[in-house]
Amino acid sequence: MADPKSSFLNVYSILKSELLQDPAFEFSTDSRQWVERMLDYNVPGGKLNRGLSVIDSYKLLKDGQELNDEEIFLASALGWCIEWLQAYFLVLDDIMDNSHTRRGHPCWFRVPKVGMIAPNDGVVLRNHIPRILKKHFRGKPYYVDLLDLFNEVEFQTASGQMIDLITTLEGEKDLSKYTLSLHRRIVQYKTAYYSFYLPVACALLMVGENLDNHTDVKNILVEMGTYFQVQDDYLDCFGAPETIGKIGTDIEDFKCSWLVVKALELSNEEQKKVLYENYGKPDPANVAKVKTLYNELNLEGAYADYESKSYEKLVTCIEGHPSKAVQGVLKSFWAKIYKRQK
């Protein structure tokens, strides 16, 4: 039995070669080479957690029955659609954030000769998703639901990104806007729907379920996505760069991070003044003052408290779900993220 990741990568190669021969467009050698290089650079490079989660969830929903080759292929194809969606978001996000590196390599728009061709590449990535769905799912009873699901989640993610961008607008930096409810809204829409709900929703559609009957599952997964982002915010400041694989810049970037929101909540007037004067400034001295304040306020303790409360709440919700198979899916997600260090 090949390991799941290499079987999954084989499906990527099949989907890529189908897209490079799409009959709707007459490729020249140059354009075919461009798209192939763009795909290889942006789609398969990450941890592939979202994509692999579709297969894991589908297996659990099938109560551990052996999947046949077609079922594995289709679940993998949907997993890749999520990875394509992620690639599309990241290519465009990196331009908006003026980022330099992604997954240890230069961002796509920083690659020589790419530059501002990257926004169009993002649009191409987005348009590959319905091409894959049409080719492999058009005859399925849940085809329209799949299209609808991807469209809805993309809309939610783009809207979350918009709230994030307009909150950190240059010249309009206002810490008083930063509240737990704003943080929650950004996270829920920008991250939780596509990273946590979408893989499970794909698997539910494949086993013939109606998503309208699973709003409880959606709510639990969005809650998990929120917890995941709070962890991310915490690790950005308190995680070891060699473990998390990046140097955190949330303080410099004036991000609506859980840490700054919590700090505002716990600060007295004097401490608030330190935040207002130093948060969002690139100078290391300003950043150091914010970090010192975070330690004074014992944000590590506040995070540990948040973590244990989230654990109790989520485990209670999961164990209250009537379906053991669905519980299995939710528990497998939870096991991947609880107490992670990176």
From Swiss-Prot:
GO terms for cellular component: cytoplasm. It comes from the Eukaryota. Its EC number is 2.5.1.10, 2.5.1.1. GO terms for molecular function: (2E,6E)-farnesyl diphosphate synthase activity; dimethylallyltranstransferase activity; metal ion binding. PROSITE patterns: POLYPRENYL_SYNTHASE_1, POLYPRENYL_SYNTHASE_2. Keywords: Cholesterol biosynthesis, Cholesterol metabolism, Cytoplasm, Isoprene biosynthesis, Lipid biosynthesis, Lipid metabolism, Magnesium, Metal-binding, Steroid biosynthesis, Steroid metabolism, Sterol biosynthesis, Sterol metabolism, Transferase. Dimethylallyl diphosphate binds at residues 102, 190-191, 229, 246, 255. Mg(2+) 2 binds at residues 93, 97. Coiled coil: none annotated. Mg(2+) 1 binds at residues 93, 97. Isopentenyl diphosphate binds at residues 47, 50, 86, 103. The keyword Flavoprotein does not apply. Pathway: Isoprenoid biosynthesis; farnesyl diphosphate biosynthesis; farnesyl diphosphate from geranyl diphosphate and isopentenyl diphosphate: step 1/1; Isoprenoid biosynthesis; geranyl diphosphate biosynthesis; geranyl diphosphate from dimethylallyl diphosphate and isopentenyl diphosphate: step 1/1. Binds 2 Mg(2+) ions per subunit. Its cofactor is Mg(2+). It is found in: Cytoplasm. It catalyses: isopentenyl diphosphate + dimethylallyl diphosphate = (2E)-geranyl diphosphate + diphosphate; isopentenyl diphosphate + (2E)-geranyl diphosphate = (2E,6E)-farnesyl diphosphate + diphosphate. Catalyzes the sequential condensation of isopentenyl pyrophosphate with the allylic pyrophosphates, dimethylallyl pyrophosphate, and then with the resultant geranylpyrophosphate to the ultimate product farnesyl pyrophosphate. Belongs to the FPP/GGPP synthase family. This is Farnesyl pyrophosphate synthase 2. The lineage of its organism: Eukaryota, Viridiplantae, Streptophyta, Embryophyta, Tracheophyta. The gene is FPS2.
